[in-house]
A protein has these predicted regions:
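Hydrophobic alpha-helical connector segments
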Residues: 76, 90-119, 167-174
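Short hydrophobic/aromatic patch on the recognition helix
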Residues: 56-67
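Hydrophobic/aromatic residues within well-ordered alpha-helical segments
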Residues: 27, 70, 81, 85, ...
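Alpha-helical DNA-contacting segments of helix-turn-helix folds
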Residues: 67, 74-81
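Basic, helix-initiating cap at the start of DNA-binding domains
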Residues: 1-42, 46-58, 72-75
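Hydrophobic/aromatic-rich alpha-helical bundle segments in the mid-to-C-terminal region
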Residues: 122, 142, 159-209, 217-233, ...
Length: 238
């Protein structure tokens, strides 16, 4: 029986489909590692797809089967960084004493990772928001944005009664907070207010949005929602 089981396992390991899958995973790992190291060494603008394929030891045509262009390669690499930052922020937020502190804790790792390599961060934000609509790694990045916004909305609403009014306000606030993060991360390339500390400004703006959220949810929906037709969340719920 044991010999039969071992032979069965050997067959599965040597199965052509299994070997093909392992080869694909290995090539993707090599491409990811090559792209990550070259972007870190030279910066996004100074790296070519040929250099990445050479370092990964794959043909250029093979490289393009895993990522259609250099922008997708950057998204593939930096989605990993963004995802880790969101998870780190989730852990920090869980230890915060109140919703406002939790939101600030949640965004802190995103700001920190964005400062590790500002030029590449700017390129990542550009590809994330303005890349081709059908790019698969861009779709992964946008899903991470939605995850972050969902986390922020949940933190704002923690411990409070669930109402449509509060849910809409929390989603709006979460989107506004991501907009602040995006603006802060691309600020080095824009030269806006160079004398200001962008991270301190971002924290101040996030705190202001949080205060505005709590002020908003204390107002009756009929008073605050003078034109609900202008809000896509309300329209979608209808």
């Amino acid at each position: 029986m044991r010999g039969s089981a071992l032979r069965g396992n050997t067959l599965r390991v040597n199965d052509p489909v299994t070997r093909r899958l392992r080869n694909m995973q290995d090539k993707r790992r090599r491409i990811f590692t090559a792209a990550a190291s070259l972007f870190a060494e030279r910066g996004f603008d100074n790296v070519t797809t040929q250099a990445i394929s050479d370092r990964a030891d794959v043909a250029t045509g093979t490289l393009f089967r895993y990522a259609a262009n250099k922008g997708e390669l950057l998204l593939m690499v930096y989605n990993e960084e963004f995802g880790r930052a969101i998870n780190d922020g989730r852990g920090l937020a869980a230890r915060a004493v109140d919703p406002a502190a939790a939101v600030l804790a949640a965004v802190e790792p995103v700001l920190v990772v964005g400062r590790l390599d500002p030029p590449n961060t700017v390129a990542y934000q550009r590809e994330l928001l303005f890349g081709p609509p059908d790019a698969p790694y861009r779709a992964v990045g946008l899903a991470l944005v939605r995850d972050l916004e969902f986390l922020l909305a949940a933190l704002l609403s923690a411990g409070q009664p669930v109402t449509e009014h509060r849910a809409v306000a929390a989603r709006r606030a979460a989107r506004s907070i991501f907009a602040v993060l995006h603006h802060t991360l691309v600020q080095p390339s824009a030269g806006i207010l160079p004398e200001h500390d962008p991270d301190a400004d971002a924290r101040g703006q996030v705190a202001q949005i949080v205060l505005g959220f709590f002020a908003t949810v204390r107002v009756a929906p009929s008073e605050q929602e003078s034109d609900p037709q202008g809000d896509p969340d309300v329209l979608q719920q209808r």
